[in-house]
Each structure stands twice: as C-alpha cells, then as structure tokens.
Amino acid sequence: MTKARELQVSLQDTKYYHCISRCVRRAYLCGEDEHTGKSYEHRRQWIEDKLQQISKVFCIDVCAYAVMSNHTHFVLYADDKKANRLSDKAVLIRWHKLFKGTLHTQKFLAGEKLDKGQQFFLAKEIKEFRQRLSDISWFMRVLNEHIARKANKEDSCTGRFYSLPSMALTLRAA
C-alpha cells in the first residue's frame, strides 16, 4: 500500500533520500527518440541549470543525480538545521528568488512598517517558508514543474509530463 510522501520522509530517521521521477506518454526527457530521430539531449542542460538555481535557494544538497532517457534519479540531503539557522530576512530573500511571496513578505523586504496583525501573519508565513526550504517535496516540485512546462511547450502538448509526484526512498530502502 502506498504512503503519502510526507509520511515517508522523516528527517529524524535520515536526511538522505533517493528521489525518482518518471515521464509519461513515452515522452523523452533526454537522449534520442529511436522512432523519430529527434534529439532531446538539450533537456539535460535544462535540468542541470534548474538544479544549480534551486540548490542555491533550498537548504537541500544534491549529492548525486542521473538523467536517463525517461526518468531522473536524485540523492538529496535535506538540511533542516541549516534552514533553522537562517534569519527571517534570509528565508524570505531565498523564497522570493523562486516565488512572488505574499503582500506581507514583500512589504517586510521593502522595509515597510507592518502593524501587529500583519506581523502575526508574516511570522506564520516565514515559519512555513522556512520549513519548505528543507522540504524534499517542494524541491522536487519546483524542479519537475519547471522541466515539465518547458517540455510540454516544446512538444506542443498539455497535461502531465511526469507519471506521479517524485518518489522518495530512504537510502536504506533504495
């Protein structure tokens, strides 16, 4: 029986995880399509570029990875202690490199004064974003969604590019 990833990933047990993402509809992630002769090798660079970008934002280290013709493998280290050491401002600066943030976070970073109610919601948002910065699911979501959108645009199609959300296995299980 399958388990939700939030139940599979326990940073108290291990911080290292092996994540796998597979393509659907016989889509090529990279390599050459034997039937059409079309090369998708440039997509490997998409993955490497996005990995470099998000590795600077998230508190997750990429220990190893492999990009195959229709799937990827990543060995990730989730560093929640690093995320907890970040200042509130550092958390928001990192988060805003990938996402727009909220009105409260934008005002805070702009140096605007926040009333007590806004400060209350800002504190909740910072706590949530801090947790996400060491969350493997969020890391894989950002990576896979970016690649899927580019590949779907290139392939002139819509819908899922990856079969399921990425699967995370502890290194013991892998």
Short names for language-model regions:
Residues 1-174:
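Short catalytic/metal-binding and nucleic-acid-binding patches
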